[in-house]
Amino acid sequence: MSAGTASDTTALNTFFSAQLAETDPEIAKAISQELGRQQHEIELIASENIVSRAVLEAQGSVLTNKYAEGYPGRRYYGGCQFVDIAEELAIDRAKRLFGCGFANVQPNSGSQANQGVFMALMQPGDTFLGLDLAAGGHLTHGAPPNVSGKWFKPVSYTVRREDQRIDMEQVERLAQEHKPKVIIAGGSGYPRHWDFAKFREIADSVGAYFFVDMAHFAGLVAAGLHPSPFPHAHVATTTTHKTLRGPRGGMILTNDEALAKKFNSAIFPGLQGGPLMHVIAAKAVAFGEALKPEFKIYAKQVIDNAKALADTIISGGYDITSGGTDNHLMLVDLQKKGLTGKAAEAALSRADITCNKNGVPFDPQKPTITSGIRLGTPASTTRGFGVAEFKQVGSLIVQVLDGLADKGESGDSTVEAAVKEKVHALTDRFPIYS
């Protein structure tokens, strides 16, 4: 095709104006189906949330076209004056949200934020302490298949068997024995508050850095409804989705300027090249939303809803690890009912209630089977569910699980169908992206 012809112009106009449904109907269909799933199912996966239209707009903006290696004012590419504005806004808003001096908003995920901290604070072979994955920790805190377990020497602490709370005596004992370089607090399945002051005291006693991974509860911290890692932590990381209700991504926070420089170097050029500027802009939008008074109301509702859900499930005859929750999530221990997490997840999915199978402390089952499910309230709270709705959701969960216990792994199809109808009645009352 020769340059400058009418057909060339038409092709270019089509490239810049054609809708997705025209150019790629297969992907458009998958996206439409996912929208329908989100609209009509009750989302209880603790690590998921629903972002605003504004966040979607920022993430789908022309900023996706821009390469911007480096940091604001110190880029390796020209034409970065406007993406610098977006990143500087994200940094400033993050610092205001968490009351800290320095923020790196470039990590593409919470896992990469954690890797950046490890790279900055440790050398391969160094020892660190983290919560055991089976007790509610995270893969990046030393699980054998993860780079954190391959490059470094993880030592895991756990929870007390009698109450499933962090065993701080064990943390102190292991710290004195192993003299770790870093001690981590945080995880993906721990429903209680953390004693950050005690962790810092233990870290100081052995000359370790204290690192908080607050990926799950950062939004509650930002709202002032959960203990803050600062001033106790040397560094904190978080994802920007989950309770922060932003785009999928990560972030590193600190009050130590010297450490901040190390973290910046670890992320770029250590782990990443060009940052995702469209995602960083969406982070800035979400942080701006979280600075508004309405966000504190939302975060309080998340916590109230979680307590209502946990209480309802306990009243239905099921165990919640540690006896309840202080944050947005809970683990339902299914062992006394003879159920597996895998079967429970599948049964609830058939009723259009989405959750995930999850190990419970001292779980005898394999990670692919598990003895529990993890439930969280952020996403359904975003769509407007309150305590009354979550009490109903808890009752629906109990009905499905009871049917599973009565009928075996295939579940009770009659109960599941009836619950599904009630689920749709609920979601229809609280529409999203309509």
From Swiss-Prot:
Functional pathway: One-carbon metabolism; tetrahydrofolate interconversion; Amino-acid biosynthesis; glycine biosynthesis; glycine from L-serine: step 1/1
BP terms from Gene Ontology: glycine biosynthetic process from serine; tetrahydrofolate interconversion
Binding annotation for (6S)-5,6,7,8-tetrahydrofolate: L133, G137, H138, L139
Gene Ontology MF: a single term: pyridoxal phosphate binding
Site feature (Plays an important role in substrate specificity) residues: H241
Chief location category: cytoplasm
HAMAP family hit by this protein: SHMT
Protein family membership: Belongs to the SHMT family.
Subunit description: Homodimer.
Protein name as catalogued: Serine hydroxymethyltransferase
Protein species of origin: Methylorubrum populi (strain ATCC BAA-705 / NCIMB 13946 / BJ001)
